[in-house]
């Protein structure tokens, strides 16, 4: 067996190759982070190995810096092991009392760790899908938050320019309202529209839901509005609505990509009533390989959903709060999914009602339901069975 340790950096990578006896096949060498460097690494590995040798390549999970070399190694059918930097750091400290940390030392540490740890799992196609899902779901999460902030800006601007409008429609954030405010961003502009033109605009944008009656209501309200006439705010409103439409289009595109991956994976978690594709994708992406977790409690701890513990002498905390450490994305996805599951799944609905009847606050009761959901997800993903079959 031959082990290759790679310390990944932005512009270059340090490498070390050891055999199964810990002897150096290729002392620490540096390659540039480009195709020539990748080919140099591959050629060096081939020069140091025989056809019968089993090759293991290890590198740290260093975010985007490792993506390209990882893809190159996988394309060349090499078994790659992605390691937690915390684990490699602790392992390096265990090898020596000296406080020595260089890229070359790290490369050799990774190679040595490959030799000593037989339980390491190689990077697989499933891991690739998880990385893709993680990138997409986190990107979507950020885009949704960005859109939410813009919607708050729309509400603020409408309060200044045409405050009466909010009482005439179920929501400011619907297609008909956006179409109206994109063309006429203020009470003064709306009050001067010809009724027929306003009716046609609302009818088209609402797909027939609104007609002449709603147009009359809005125009009359605009004529007597207390809204300010501020061209700068009107321009800001138009641009904000335009940005919301663009981001919504981007979110739709992201969700299509997520849906394609989920169609390939077809995970058992989707069989749970109330768990949608987007929530399921984020949960799977953040958890990754379920075999890395010994129990559902480990997943809860990873998500930061476990209660904190504090004890000092005779003092023990009576009202433990959530740790809220770990993956905030996973925590968000689990709580969001739990709300829908409690609505659509009678078992969870009854469980939530039971906890509420015990006098627990809604959020506390929901956290109990989240723990129940995590136990169910863990069981389904480990067994590979659908929810109805498992029940």
Predicted segment positions?
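A detector of single, family-specific signature residues
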Residues: 1-391
